[in-house]
Amino acid sequence: MARDTRADLFERIAQGSMWDLMLLSGGVSMGKYDLVEEVLREFGAEFFFTGALIQPGKPVVFGRLPKRGSFQHGEDGEYSVPHDGPWNGEWTYFFGLPGNPVSAQVCFALFVAPMLRALAGRSEIAPVFVEARLAEEVKGGARVTRFLPAELSGGWDGVEVRVVGWQGSGDVVANARGNGYVVLPAGVEHFPIGLTVRVLLR
């Protein structure tokens, strides 16, 4: 946990910069106290992308910064050892996820989980999608691709998906009722009953 101050964020990011991968949640939007990107730049961060054309989850960042130390094992457990001298060429990769829980979960499934699988040496690293028929019509018209909490159910005649009623990216109760996210592409005005759509599993 970090307070929304530059000093506290600096300390936490300094600690995280000794790991191979650092995850941050919150502070990556455009508000007065969203300081994560600014502080990361002070560490020499290189950003691969800042923001994604999805909803929820638009304010997400991914990049890397010079690794500032390492972890070693001793008799009393694991401890950190800051690097002295010039940078040794190693990187700490980072994700800055949105603070809202549904947004963070969508971004984790889309971006973070594949990165973790890659670091673990897995051959299949991509997000997992399945196809299902819409059990009810869904209104479209969004300018970004939407990932809406949804419930998959199946039988002998195939798999259906139904959007879970929710009140936004902070609605953890509604999100918990689903088992995936139905993918609604940008620019489509209407998604009729029976349409085959993709569903992101979580």
Regions found by a protein language model. Name each.
Residues 42-202:
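Flexible glycine/proline-rich
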Residues 1-35, 39-43:
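N-terminal small/polar loop signature for handling phosphorylated ligands or for N-terminal nucleophile
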